[in-house]
C-alpha cells in the first residue's frame, strides 16, 4: 500500500518492489549498468548523462497534482474545523471522518509537494537528506494505513448503530470513538515503524554534478515482498470485504424498515412518532455517503494495487511513465475527494461548510461554539447522535 511518490530512482524501480517512485526518464538498461559499475565494484564510477522529465510531463503533472493538492488540503482542513467547532456535527461517525481527513492530509502533505518538485530536479536527486528520506516514507505509509483503518472504523460504527440500536447507545458514543481513533493511530504508527529503518540514501553520479544522492530501499526487493502483501491484505482487501458484508447487512435492515413504512401507509396506519421516519431517512443518507466513500477508495486505489501485484509476479515489470503518473494521481485524488463527497451528499455537512465559510456573522448565528464545549453532551441525545452524520 505504498505511495512514496518521488523517492526511488528508476533503477531501483526495476529491481525493487515499489512502483510509484519513478522519477527518471532515462533508459532502465543504462541505469542498471550504472549501478553495476558504481556500487558493486566500488572502484569504477560511471557517470550518467543528466536526465530530466519532458516539458509536457512536467506541465501536466504540476497542474493536475497541484490542483488536487490545494483542493484536498483546504477541503480536509474544512472537515476538521466544522466537526470540531460545530456542536451538532460532533457525532461518532464524524469523529472517524475527522480521523480520515487528518490521514488524507498527511498523505497529501508528505507526497504531492515532493512529487511535483521531482519533475524539476535532476534525475533521481533527493534534496532532503537521510532524515527527510526516513520521515517522508514513514509519514506516507502512516497516512495511507490510518485512512484505511478509519474507513473500517466508521463502517463498523454504522453497522452497530443501525443493526444493533440498543447496543449502540452504549457503544457508539463520541468518547468511545475518540478512544478508538487513538488506538487506530497508535496501531498505524507501530505497524509503519519498520520504515524508519528500511530506507536509506545512496550517492548518484551525473556528469557535471557532484554530491548528489537519492532515497531508496535499504534492503533488496525480496525482503519487502511479505511486508507489501501484508499491506495489500490488511489495508485494502480486508477492509473492502468487511465493508461489503456490513453494508449489505445495513441495507437489509434499512430496506426492511422502508418496506414496513410503505405497508403501513398503504393500509392507512399512521406513524405515531414522525421522528422515527426522520431518523431512518437520516440514516439512509449517511449510509449512502459512507458507502460512496468506500467505493471511491476501492476504485481509486485499484490501478496501483493491480500494478503492484502484476509487477511482483511478472518477469518484465510494467514501468510506463504516464501510467505511473496516472496511478499516483488516482491516489492523490482519493485523499482529496472526500470533502467534496460530504458536501454533495450530506445536507448537514453542506450547511456546516456554508456557515464556516460565511463572513461577518456572530458565533451564535453561524452555530459555532468553543471547542471545549463540544464534548459536553447529555445522555438523552446519544441515541440520536448515532443516527446522524
Residue spans of the language-model regions?
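Fourth transmembrane helix
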Residues: 143-153, 160, 164-213, 238-255
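First transmembrane helix
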Residues: 57-85
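Extracellular TM2-ECL1-early TM3 structural module of rhodopsin-like
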Residues: 57-66, 92-99, 103-153, 161-164, ...
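Juxtamembrane loop-transmembrane helix junctions in multi-pass integral membrane proteins
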Residues: 49-63, 88-91, 124-131, 138, ...
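Loop architecture of class A 7-transmembrane GPCRs
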Residues: 44-51, 121-137, 142, 170, ...
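Helix-to-loop junction signature of class
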Residues: 65-68, 106-123, 137, 144-151, ...
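Seventh transmembrane helix
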Residues: 299-308, 325-373
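Intrinsically disordered regulatory tails of 7TM GPCRs
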Residues: 1-52, 208, 256-287, 347-389
Amino acid at each position: 500500500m505504498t505511495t512514496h511518490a518521488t523517492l526511488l530512482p528508476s533503477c531501483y524501480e526495476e529491481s525493487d518492489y515499489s512502483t510509484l517512485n519513478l522519477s527518471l526518464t532515462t533508459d532502465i538498461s543504462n541505469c542498471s549498468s550504472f549501478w553495476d559499475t558504481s556500487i558493486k565494484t566500488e572502484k569504477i564510477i560511471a557517470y550518467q548523462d543528466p536526465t530530466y522529465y519532458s516539458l509536457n510531463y512536467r506541465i501536466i503533472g504540476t497542474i493536475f497534482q497541484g490542483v488536487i493538492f490545494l483542493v484536498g488540503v483546504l477541503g480536509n482542513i474544512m472537515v476538521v474545523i466544522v466537526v470540531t467547532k460545530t456542536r451538532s456535527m460532533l457525532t461518532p461517525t464524524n469523529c472517524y471522518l475527522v480521523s480520515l481527513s487528518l490521514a488524507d492530509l498527511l498523505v497529501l502533505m508528505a507526497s504531492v509537494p515532493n512529487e511535483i518538485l521531482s519533475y524539476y530536479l535532476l534525475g533521481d536527486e533527493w534534496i532532503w537528506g537521510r532524515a527527510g528520506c526516513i520521515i517522508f516514507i514513514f509519514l506516507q505509509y502512516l497516512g495511507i494505513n490510518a485512512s484505511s483503518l478509519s474507513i473500517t472504523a466508521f463502517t463498523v460504527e454504522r453497522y452497530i448503530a443501525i443493526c444493533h440500536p440498543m447496543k449502540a447507545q452504549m457503544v457508539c458514543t463520541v468518547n468511545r470513538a475518540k478512544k478508538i481513533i487513538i488506538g487506530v493511530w497508535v496501531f498505524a504508527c507501530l505497524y509503519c515503524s519498520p520504515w524508519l529503518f528500511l530506507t536509506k540514501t545512496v550517492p548518484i553520479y551525473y556528469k557535471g554534478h557532484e554530491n548528489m544522492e537519492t532515497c531508496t530501499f535499504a534492503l533488496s526487493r525480496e525482503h519487502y515482498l511479505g511486508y507489501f502483501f501484508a499491506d495489500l491484505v490488511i489495508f485494502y482487501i480486508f477492509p473492502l470485504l468487511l465493508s461489503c458484508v456490513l453494508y449489505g447487512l445495513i441495507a437489509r435492515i434499512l430496506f426492511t424498515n422502508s418496506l414496513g413504512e410503505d405497508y403501513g401507509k398503504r393500509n392507512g396506519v399512521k406513524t405515531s412518532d414522525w421522528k422515527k421516519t426522520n431518523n431512518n431517512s437520516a440514516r439512509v443518507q449517511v449510509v449512502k455517503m459512507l458507502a460512496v466513500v468506500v467505493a471511491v477508495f476501492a476504485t481509486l486505489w485499484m490501478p496501483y494495487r493491480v500494478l503492484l501485484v502484476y509487477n511482483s509476479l511478472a518477469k518484465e515489470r510494467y514501468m510506463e511513465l504516464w501510467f505511473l503518473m496516472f496511478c499516483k494521481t488516482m491516489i492523490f485524488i482519493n485523499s482529496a475527494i472526500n470533502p467534496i463527497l460530504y458536501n454533495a451528499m450530506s445536507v448537514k455537512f453542506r450547511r456546516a461548510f456554508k456557515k464556516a465559510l460565511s463572513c461577518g456573522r456572530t458565533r451564535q448565528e453561524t452555530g459555532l461554539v468553543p471547542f471545549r464545549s463540544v464534548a459536553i453532551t447529555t445522555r438523552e441525545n446519544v441515541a440520536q447522535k448515532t443516527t446522524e452524520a
